[in-house]
Amino acid sequence: MSATKTLEAVARDRVGKGAARAVRRQGQIPAVIYGGNQAPQAIAIDLIRARTLIYAGGFKTTVFEIDAGGKKTRAIPRDYQLDPVSGVPLHVDFLRVVAGQTVTVDVPVHFVNEDQAPGIKQKGGTLNVALHTLSLEVAPDQIPDAIEVDLAGREIGDVIHASDLRLPAGTYTGEPTDTVANLLPPTVLGADVEAEEAAVAEAQSAESAEGKAEAEAEATNEKNKSEA
């Protein structure tokens, strides 16, 4: 489970596009904390700190204790906006964490022991991943960093369903039969190329034989004409 992280912030008394631009000029980004049957709280957080947290991974599954001028609030990121060109964070939305309530988060799926899967290591199969994240509804202090899928012993043709994974009971929001990944047989490019080349050679041979037969028939006709 992810540990709660501290995030320093500054309370904002002005909102809107003009106020947001002013915040960004100061090396911060605007953010808001909402939910928990309380009024939204506008804050600003350090740009470099926000960028580091977002690009480090696991940002949206981490609970933060946000300290805005001495007022501390536990919250989890629900969304963020990035500049489409530079990738710089522009805004973050936080959801208040309330005791006794659950949150829905998308937890990344990590595949381990791929080198111990005979279908991949010895037989050249390919791991086809259908779900890179799983949506879980859990208590904030029970959010896993990632969901591990053990590939040891897996063979070509094996299908891994959500029900095969070790998840906190009753937390997965999808269906138990959802396919997470499967092992596909290798694509035999060499055999395909050889088959194609053989087909081309056969067609060329047939064309050559047909041309030879036509030439022989024409020569016979010419001979018959000259003898007549």
UniProtKB/Swiss-Prot annotation:
The keyword Transferase does not apply. It comes from the Bacteria. The keyword Ribosomal protein applies. InterPro entries: Rbsml_bL25/Gln-tRNA_synth_N (IPR020056), Ribosomal_bL25/Gln-tRNA_synth (IPR011035), Ribosomal_bL25_b-dom (IPR020057), Ribosomal_bL25_C (IPR037121), Ribosomal_bL25_long (IPR001021), Ribosomal_L25_dom (IPR029751), Ribosomal_uL5_bac-type (IPR020930). GO terms for molecular function: 5S rRNA binding; structural constituent of ribosome. One of its GO terms (cellular component) is cytosolic large ribosomal subunit. Residues 196-228 are annotated as: Disordered. SUPFAM superfamilies: Ribosomal protein L25-like. Residues 209-228 have a biased composition (Basic and acidic residues). Keywords: Ribonucleoprotein, Ribosomal protein, RNA-binding, rRNA-binding. One of its GO terms (biological process) is translation. PANTHER family: RIBOSOMAL PROTEIN L25/GLN-TRNA SYNTHETASE, ANTI-CODON-BINDING DOMAIN-CONTAINING PROTEIN, RIBOSOMAL PROTEIN L25_GLN-TRNA SYNTHETASE, ANTI-CODON-BINDING DOMAIN-CONTAINING PROTEIN. This is one of the proteins that binds to the 5S RNA in the ribosome where it forms part of the central protuberance. Belongs to the bacterial ribosomal protein bL25 family. CTC subfamily. Part of the 50S ribosomal subunit; part of the 5S rRNA/L5/L18/L25 subcomplex. Contacts the 5S rRNA. Binds to the 5S rRNA independently of L5 and L18. This is Large ribosomal subunit protein bL25.
